[in-house]
């Protein structure tokens, strides 16, 4: 089972992810907590230095930080070299003009998802909790498959056109065939990713807070994911001020702390109602987490 937690920065994704992972580990399930957030705040929450390979936290819980940027750069460098090889004999072709096109958004996110997929297929863990970077990075990751597929198909079409040019001779033909094969394999894995994200074995959860910015970001993200066919399972609203009751609220006039708390409690009520309506309209589950 994969739990993918996402939401805007500062809403408590890492705290929720760590709590989720610890819960399953305490239930006796072998659990892996993975963070793709560049800030790597998981280290701070768990108070353990976490590296790029699974680090043992408890008997049933491992954790790791992932940074797929280096792997993505290495792969794209290979792509660039092969494109230069294919196009080098074309009159007027600038071998460096393709460099920027090769570094399109989403490749590092693709390799991050590749790592998650590999751990899921290995069956070393029953539960994987994926603490993602803020929403923008996550959306780029979720849309990366289509962007990468489009990019790969452009390269393959380019190869076909070049092969049809009269008198054109490929350099490093055997290497070119290998890179084309690798591109085609990536297309196949992209299809697997999309099926995986929509499967019952994945729970994509939006973490939010009861504020205007928090609600708007959550609603936009939900709408976007629905548009690309990625189902959201639940919305987790964090930092809720609980109802402390009449005895506490009665001290508002004489206790500044009570007054501030009651003010925040009152401000949050309308947003909690909006979240409630949002999950009802979209048949989702709503989970509320209080600040105390």
Predicted segments with their positions:
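Nucleotide-state-sensitive switch-loop elements of NTP-binding domains
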Residues: 1-11, 15-187, 191
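C-terminal lobe/tail of nucleotide-utilizing enzymes
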Residues: 193-292
């Amino acid at each position: 089972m994969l739990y993918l937690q996402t939401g805007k920065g500062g809403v408590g994704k890492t705290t929720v992810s760590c709590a989720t992972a610890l819960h399953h580990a305490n239930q006796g399930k072998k659990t892996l907590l993975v963070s793709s957030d560049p800030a790597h705040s998981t280290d701070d929450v768990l108070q353990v230095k976490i590296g790029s390979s699974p680090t043992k936290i408890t008997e049933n819980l491992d954790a790791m930080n992932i940074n797929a940027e280096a792997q993505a750069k290495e792969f794209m460098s290979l792509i660039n070299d092969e494109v230069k090889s294919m196009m080098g004999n074309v009159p007027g072709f600038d071998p460096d003009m393709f460099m920027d096109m090769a570094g399109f958004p989403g490749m590092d996110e693709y390799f991050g998802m590749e790592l998650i997929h590999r751990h899921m297929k290995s069956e070393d863990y029953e539960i994987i909790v994926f603490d993602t970077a803020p929403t923008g990075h996550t959306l780029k990751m979720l849309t990366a498959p289509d962007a990468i597929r489009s990019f790969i198909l452009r390269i393959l079409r380019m190869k076909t056109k070049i092969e049809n040019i009269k008198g054109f001779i490929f350099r490093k033909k055997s290497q070119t065939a290998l890179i084309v094969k690798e591109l085609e394999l990536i297309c196949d894995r992209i299809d697997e990713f999309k099926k995986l994200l929509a499967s019952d074995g994945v729970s994509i959860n939006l973490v939010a807070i009861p504020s205007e910015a928090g609600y708007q970001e959550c609603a936009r993200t939900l709408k976007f994911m629905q548009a690309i066919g990625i189902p959201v399972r639940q919305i987790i609203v964090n930092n809720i001020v609980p109802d402390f009751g009449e005895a506490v609220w009665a001290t508002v006039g004489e206790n500044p702390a009570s007054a501030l708390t009651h003010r925040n409690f009152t401000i949050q009520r309308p947003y909690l109602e909006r979240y409630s309506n949002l999950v009802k309209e979209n048949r989702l589950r709503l989970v509320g987490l209080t600040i105390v």
